[in-house]
C-alpha cells in the first residue's frame, strides 16, 4: 500500500518513537515539499520517505485559504498520485479529502493498524504517550479506539 502524509502524523509518530511503523504499514510513503519543510525542525525524514514535487495544486480557494501549506499540498499530491491512503489528522482536512474521494487515515488509525498487525503490543501506551506530548485525543475517541483494539477495561 502507498501513502501520502501530512506533517502532523509524522511529527506525532516521531515524538513517540514510532515513525518506523509507517515503513511496516506501507510499501511507500511520500510527502510534498511543504510537509518536508514543516517537519524539518522536528523530524529528520528517513530515506524511505520520498519528497515528491507537486505538478499542480488543487484549484480550490477553500483548500488554500482553510488549510496550511502541508495539508493543501498533501491533498493535492494525493489527488495527483492516488495513493491507497492519505495520512491526515486535522478533521476539516480529512473531511475535504474524503469529499474528494481520497481514503484517509490518521495517527490513531495507523496505531490501530499496527496493533492489529502485531507491530506494537498495545495501543493504550502509545495513545498515552501521544497525549503526554500534547497530542489532543477527545475522551470519546480515545475510548472508541481502545474498544476497536480490544483494550478497553
Set out the residue ranges of the language-model regions.
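Active-site-proximal, substrate-binding regions of enzyme catalytic domains
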Residues: 1-85, 91-94, 98-103, 125, ...
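Conserved short-loop catalytic and cofactor-binding motifs
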Residues: 62-66, 111, 133
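Long, charge-dense
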Residues: 107, 112-119
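Long, charged alpha-helical interface segments
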Residues: 116-153
Amino acid at each position: 500500500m502507498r501513502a501520502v502524509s501530512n506533517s502532523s502524523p509524522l511529527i506525532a509518530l516521531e515524538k513517540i518513537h514510532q515513525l518506523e511503523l509507517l515503513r511496516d504499514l506501507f510499501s511507500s510513503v511520500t510527502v510534498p515539499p511543504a510537509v518536508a519543510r514543516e517537519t524539518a525542525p522536528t523530524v529528520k525524514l528517513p530515506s524511505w520517505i520520498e519528497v515528491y514535487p507537486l505538478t499542480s495544486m488543487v484549484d480550490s480557494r477553500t483548500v488554500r485559504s482553510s488549510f496550511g501549506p502541508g495539508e493543501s499540498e498533501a491533498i493535492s499530491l494525493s489527488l495527483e498520485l492516488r495513493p491507497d491512503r492519505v495520512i491526515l489528522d486535522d478533521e476539516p482536512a480529512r473531511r475535504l479529502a474524503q469529499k474528494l474521494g481520497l481514503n484517509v487515515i490518521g495517527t490513531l488509525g495507523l496505531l490501530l493498524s499496527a496493533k492489529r498487525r502485531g507491530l506494537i503490543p498495545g495501543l493504550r501506551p502509545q495513545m498515552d504517550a501521544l497525549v503526554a506530548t500534547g497530542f489532543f485525543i477527545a475522551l470519546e475517541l480515545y475510548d472508541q479506539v481502545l474498544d476497536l483494539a480490544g483494550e478497553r477495561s
